[in-house]
Amino acid sequence: MPNLLIQGGQPLNGTIRPHGNKNAALPTLCASLLTDELVVLDNIPHITDVEKLVSYFKDMGSKVYWDKGAKRIELSHRDFGKAGNAALPVGMRSSVLLFAPLLHRIGQVPLAVNAKGCALGVRELDPHIEIMHHFGAEMIQSASAIDLKIAKPMQGCRHWADYMSVTATENFVMAAVLAKGNSILLNAASEPHVQDVCRFLVQLGAKISGIGTSRIEIEGVDSLSSGAFQISSDFHEVVTFLALGAMTDGHVEVHDVQTEHFDLIIRSFAKLGVSVENDGETLSVFPGQTRVIQKPLTSNILPKIEAAPWPYFPVDLLPLMIALSVRAQGEVQFWNKVYENGFSWIPELTKFGAHVVTSDPHRIVVFGNRPLRPATVEAPYIIRAAVALYMVAATIEGESRVIHADPIRRAHPGFVENLQRLGAVVHWD
């Protein structure tokens, strides 16, 4: 696997335009299967999971034109299924987002039971299968596979989810837009990428209300039309570059930001002593940040950042703020309320000299501003943890290495090139 070789200690300065959000691009590509008409998607990131979906579409007979330089994909699925019966893409959790589209198009979904995307912990299939069952699908299970089949058009339903699952919400929406009658989902996820998928489907003629809330109501339609849609910018990249600017005492401006999603994120930066300036569609950090962790008015508790489903602080951003806190003065608790394996990479972070105490599988305390040293660390199969390890290394004078850093490419095209434009000394080894 590729490694990152880092010469740290340089301040990062410059402007950045983030790529499209991976977590919006993948379900939107899957949702394009719900129409036979031409679909044009802009701001599509060039990442491995998109490559896998495009290959799958082509293997199944779809016509796909991908202009990688322009970040545009044009899709026509009119002949989908006529070229054979290709296996679902492997090694990507997003394969579950093909459940509803495939049941609508060909009436069945063959699925290996070990679909996964990263090492964050148990990522169960049950919520997705339960939703498809509510819409009329039947499950046939063997030791190594699960087949979902449906013999008649989907019927609208009401479902109260156990928890706010992003992909389960997206699967429900994709099933409901072409189901007969009305459907209601309670305890729906509302992340910006979920909103993107819903707005894309509305662009094609779907009738969805409650977008961005925990209650989504959908009136099924007979068919969807053609349409064009632009994927929103990746707020994970936005936070990464802002934090790197603050950590290295640099000046970084990030453009094309949907700043309406950043109120809580900006306040979380402030908890770590970093001021983020908001200028419409641009967020900036400047040199001279205090990086002193704010103490709460209640003096006997630690300052903390809690991560949970939106509109809480996004759990995928937690590693990036942990990296920033290592370079801040004071103590802060991080609480991951979603993944039981979300802090498995912390022992690698401590190889740099970071002082982190693991309280339990969901909580850690970072004691910031300790002396750090260059190190060779191993990234887990967790995208943002690999990024966070790079971020800390970038602040330390001398040569560090992040081995097995390839998961970064699953979400961040041109990651190294963007860093180099900001003045970082880093390359793939």
Predicted feature residues:
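Short, structured segments at the rim of ligand-binding sites
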Residues: 1-429
